[in-house]
Amino acid sequence: MTSGPFDPSLWRTVDGFDFTDITYHRHVVDGADHGTVRIAFDRPEVRNAFRPHTVDELYRALDHARTTTDVGCVLLTGNGPSPTDGVWAFCAGGDQRIRGRDGYRYTMPEGAGDAEREMVDPARAGRLHILEAQRLIRFMPKVVICVVPGWAAGGGHSLHVVCDLTIASAEHARFKQTDADVGSFDGGFGSAYLARQIGQKFARQIFFLGEEHSAQAAH
């Protein structure tokens, strides 16, 4: 699925990948590759929430863009709208359905049956490896622009924070930290960079209160 503002005639799918949770395109101008790529979360039915598999794909695409010498700009966005209610989202953070005590799980969440839990590979236990993608965004020598067509919540809000620039829909964009709602805290780059950008007290207000902010208020 691709979003309404996305014009397929101006982009081509980047070869060599078989992504299921994201889409990865290269901008095309007059039939030739341009130095911009578009990486989009592609789970609009769950507000583009990410699971470990999603983050693995995101990291691969980001790293490919990082090492592609004629790419200078990365657009990070979310496809939509949701097929169920028509709501737009950039990313709603981690998929809470698969969250365990040790992080987000590749396979079965806590509470699954014994037979299902025996399938869990210890090497693929719960983890918070979205932090690895955040670090790659911060330190890659390319401009990363977050394009927010709707909700940027929780870990999705943190991703927008760590990008170099953010372009948001005046009509649909909504920003919110959900830590207080789900009982977790972003101890990675998202919280640290937000405090550097807007100040310690306002950053704490955003994290502690979990209030919703429009694009105009966020600006």
Predicted regions and their residues:
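Crotonase-fold acyl-CoA enzyme core
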Residues: 135-219
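Charged catalytic carboxylate motif
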Residues: 53, 57, 129, 136
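Hydrophobic/aromatic residues within transmembrane alpha-helices
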Residues: 39, 76, 95, 159-160, ...
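Conserved CoA-thioester-binding segment of acyl-CoA-metabolizing enzymes
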Residues: 1-84
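Glycine- (often His-adjacent) and acidic-residue-rich active-site loop
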Residues: 46, 78-131, 183
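Short, flexible loop segments at the rims of nucleotide/cofactor-binding pockets, characterized by
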Residues: 51-52, 121-125, 145
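Surface-exposed intrinsically disordered loops and tails
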Residues: 9-13, 108-111, 122, 212
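Short, charged helix-to-loop "capping" segments that act as catalytic/coupling loops
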Residues: 26-35, 75-92, 164-180
